[in-house]
Amino acid sequence: MPLAMLLLLLLLLSPDSQTAHGHPLYTRLSPGALQVLSAQGTQALQAAQRSAQWAIKRVLMEIQHRLHECQGPGRPRPQAPLLQDPPEPVQCGERHQGVANTTRAHGRIVGGSTAPSGAWPWLVRLQLGGLPLCGGVLVAASWVLTAAHCFAGASNELLWTVMLAEGPQGEQAEEVQVNRILPHPKFDPQTFHNDLALVQLWTPVSPEGPARPICLPQGSREPPAGTPCAIAGWGALFEDGPESEAVREARVPLLSADTCQKVLGPGLRPSTMLCAGYLAGGIDSCQGDSGGPLTCSEPGPRPREVLFGVTSWGDGCGEPGKPGVYTRVTVFKDWLQEQMSAGPSTREPSCRELLNWNAREEEPFTDAPGLCAFYARQCLGSESSCARLALQQCLQRRRRCELRSLAHTLLGLLRGAQELLGPRPGLRRGVSAPARSAPSLQELPGHNPREQRLYSGSRIAGTWLQKPKPERRPETKGCPGLEPLQQKLAAIQRAHAWILQIPAEHLAMNFHEVLADLGSKTLTGLFRAWVRAGLGDQRVVFSGLVGLEPSTLAHSLPRLLVQALKAFRSASLTEGEPQAPWIGADQGQRLGKERQGQLQPPVP
């Protein structure tokens, strides 16, 4: 741990001790430490509220999607999940009206031209912990195609979001959570062979929004060498330089396989890679452009753009004799169609699906058979026994997802999102690592930043002081499938009512006091403590374990935040009942009554 960190923590930990017969028995955390703990608790509350809002928004989008299907032309309605899209979207590859369908011939991503607003409606930005890492291409309402190497060491979907394209009039881009990440099973991180990944969005893209999908190739044919194609992204303006704040575009010619092999050597695999650019250099993609599109125009009455390559790697940026390398999309078209059309029983449910599934062991949720069907594929028993087995395995996996999500969430809050983006060896066309933030109380020694999880929302529930406003439900008459979605919406609203109804001005957690028993040290160096905290007008007291050394305190903070959330949840569930001054009778007996706003330890 850095010396500056130790000094900071030692200053914050100036103890307020109480003694008996000259020997300290109890100590209080300093006001500075309580202030930092309160700030982290407030961040946890804010993240939980955002997650709850996203969960409701996603179901509302599903309801709108179902209504759109019901109101469309009469056609058989598939029983596939709502997040599943046909592999070939309608009106793909078309730019918005008023936006020219040409890319500047002399533009450069490395130091060059800014693309007009809305010129790349299929271009998206993949964000890890809220920080941009790679580009991507929208290929269907719920699917983004990108480079597999973007997820090296960070393949948990809970960490990722996708920023969609802005509109032609500068409309604000929409941020969407990621439901599933599917790297190609044969991706080789050493050679970048098969460098392709599909990302399933948690919320389908609205057909009325500014984002539009690109067209996928219809067959195995590619444009001939010399064809001018287009690239775009937010990548670095020069090698190892800063990223661009706006989308930049360039037009580059496709090069023949022989030329690519000659200039790039054995690192190029012509079977799955193609290259494009100028042998004289100067125009190329760069760090941060990974996963972005290489598109070529398809002539016709209504010209459209077709995706033929995904930005993969390169030796430098815009250097002479070193064109950029792109993964061939035509080679993987069958795999893409298979993944995007797969039914729910063919793959394990994602953590995000399970964390938003309000199942109970004694009262299974109505969509359990579809969500858990994957686990019943090889069951040889009766239908009912297989359903029970699938539900049990679903619940077990959800518990693991909850533990991972909660633990890594709080660790991520304590370290800060920027810690997720340390140097990542092996990325040839990856994003340059941002500078580390200054050391703070959130530092956790020995923890691998790639294993962190951002806050995805704890399953806290209850009520706030306000009466919940009923959601207006769309008309369900004559549209099958809406009633289960409305039931799902109501269940999510009940589960998250407490956090959803906290007014913004009250969304702050305050730790008033942490009183540690110096005679209760555990083998891990933690001490039993009693914590007094507040949220708005609510006051709770609960027990926990706290460290009094810099390193042990940092490790004990996540658990304290979890216990605080649980305590406020319990308090909200018992609202209206006579409130005891303590959470738990044993704590009240040990501590006695509250006097003058402080926890008073018993003195022998």
Swiss-Prot record:
Residues 70-94, 424-452, 578-604 are annotated as: Disordered. Residues 75-89 have a biased composition (Pro residues). One of its GO terms (biological process) is camera-type eye development. PROSITE patterns: TRYPSIN_DOM, TRYPSIN_HIS, TRYPSIN_SER. InterPro entries: Peptidase_S1_PA, Peptidase_S1_PA_chymotrypsin, Peptidase_S1A, Trypsin_dom, TRYPSIN_HIS, TRYPSIN_SER. It is a peripheral membrane protein. GO terms for cellular component: endoplasmic reticulum; endoplasmic reticulum membrane. Expressed in the eye: present in the retina and in the optic nerve. One of its GO terms (molecular function) is serine-type endopeptidase activity. Serine protease required during eye development. PANTHER family: ACROSIN-RELATED, SERINE PROTEASE 56. This is Serine protease 56. The lineage of its organism: Eukaryota, Metazoa, Chordata, Craniata, Vertebrata.
